[in-house]
């Protein structure tokens, strides 16, 4: 069986993956390398796409995706945040959501994504800030509806064993998830750092 990981050199897949994730060598120590051959086409699509994850999941599952807001709060950075280009003492918004679809004849929905974001409010237009007050819209949809010209920059990816989760998704602790991190830029400034986690099994 193939055991390609992003760290392996001189294959088309790994060369291409390294070109997509610009900071793979700086991924957190808690992330393990991904065995690319073990991913399904759906998982590979989620890993590398630079569009709206919600739309992709809806197209794949033929089901409406519900954005469930788990937690959102303002916090003050205790140290400098180099990825967001912010000094210590700046205010950010911490936001955690799940993207899930209903299952017929079952009360428990399927969780496709758990997303943890740090957002720089002073760099966002009022329409997005107002939209953040709703628990029914994902960040991708808010960005698109705002008309803001934004781009995504993929940073790193890996396999993560989830821990320290909000109570609503605490049952996922100990499970392995595919993790990817990326920045959203507009006007040459980072607006948010997003960590998206997708079920591995």
Language-model-derived ranges and their functions:
Residues 2-178, 184-201:
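N-terminal domain-onset segments
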């Amino acid at each position: 069986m193939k055991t390609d990981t992003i760290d392996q050199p001189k294959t088309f897949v790994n060369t291409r993956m390294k070109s997509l994730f610009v900071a793979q060598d700086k991924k957190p120590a808690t992330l393990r390398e991904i065995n690319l051959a073990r991913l399904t086409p759906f998982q590979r699509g989620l890993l590398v796409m630079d569009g709206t994850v919600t739309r992709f999941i809806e197209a794949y599952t033929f089901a409406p995706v519900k954005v469930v807001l788990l937690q959102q709060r303002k916090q003050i950075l205790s140290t400098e945040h180099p990825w967001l280009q912010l000094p210590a003492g700046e205010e950010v918004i911490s936001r955690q959501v799940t993207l899930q679809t209903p299952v017929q004849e079952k009360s428990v929905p399927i969780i496709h994504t758990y997303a943890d974001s740090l957002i720089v409010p002073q760099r966002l237009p009022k329409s997005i800030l107002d939209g953040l007050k709703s628990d029914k819209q994902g960040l991708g949809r808010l960005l698109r509806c705002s008309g803001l010209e934004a781009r995504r920059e993929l940073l790193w990816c890996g396999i993560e064993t989830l821990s320290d989760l909000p109570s609503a998704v605490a049952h996922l602790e100990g499970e392995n998830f595919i993790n990817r991190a990326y920045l959203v830029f507009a006007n040459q400034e980072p607006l948010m750092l997003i960590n998206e986690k997708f079920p591995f099994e």
